[in-house]
């Protein structure tokens, strides 16, 4: 018989830096999950990813307090900021431009995000990421 799902917990945790402090501890503690077990498993799974990059994770908590988790790719905005070499996007994206990204960088980000975005072609994902870039005050070249 399959285990009964008790809850789904969605978090963004820095790669390789999960620890019992907020937001991880309180979110998992409410569900009765062994927090350190999750932290060790998450850090082991994300050790190949650049340390500190925020990784969305969906944790499935079962009624017997066991859990499984699925990691996603980093948010497009984070990858765009990294590609453009900026700390944050523009507060006024239509007026103040804060950086530039090339079409090649956009394609690379789209191919990275392809695992999470189902049913869309790379070109469609590129257009979506270009829109995100423009809304952050980045100029898309090429």
From Swiss-Prot:
Keywords assigned: Methylation, Ribonucleoprotein, Ribosomal protein, RNA-binding, rRNA-binding
GO cellular component: cytosolic large ribosomal subunit
Modifications after synthesis and translation: One or more lysine residues are methylated.
Superkingdom of the organism of origin: Bacteria
Keyword Ribonucleoprotein set for record: yes
Cross-referenced SMART domains: RL11
CDD domains (UniProt xref): Ribosomal_L11
GO molecular function ontology, one term from the record: structural constituent of ribosome
GO-annotated biological processes: translation
Coiled-coil stretches: none
Biological function: Forms part of the ribosomal stalk which helps the ribosome interact with GTP-bound translation factors.
Record-stated family: Belongs to the universal ribosomal protein uL11 family.
Subunit composition and interactions: Part of the ribosomal stalk of the 50S ribosomal subunit. Interacts with L10 and the large rRNA to form the base of the stalk. L10 forms an elongated spine to which L12 dimers bind in a sequential fashion forming a multimeric L10(L12)X complex.
The protein, known as: Large ribosomal subunit protein uL11
Gene coding for it: rplK
């Amino acid at each position: 018989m399959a285990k009964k799902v008790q809850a789904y917990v969605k978090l963004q945790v820095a790669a390789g830096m999960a620890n019992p402090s907020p937001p991880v501890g309180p979110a998992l503690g409410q569900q009765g999950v062994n927090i350190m077990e999750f932290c060790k498993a998450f850090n082991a799974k994300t050790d190949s990813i650049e340390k500190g990059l925020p990784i969305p994770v969906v944790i499935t908590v079962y009624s017997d307090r066991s859990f499984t988790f699925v990691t996603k790719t980093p948010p497009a905005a984070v990858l765009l900021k990294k590609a453009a070499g900026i700390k944050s996007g523009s507060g006024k994206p239509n007026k103040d431009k804060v950086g530039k990204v090339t079409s090649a960088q956009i394609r690379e980000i789209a191919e990275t995000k392809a695992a999470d975005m189902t049913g869309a072609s790379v070109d469609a994902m590129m257009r979506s990421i270009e829109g995100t870039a423009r809304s952050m005050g980045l100029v898309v070249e090429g």
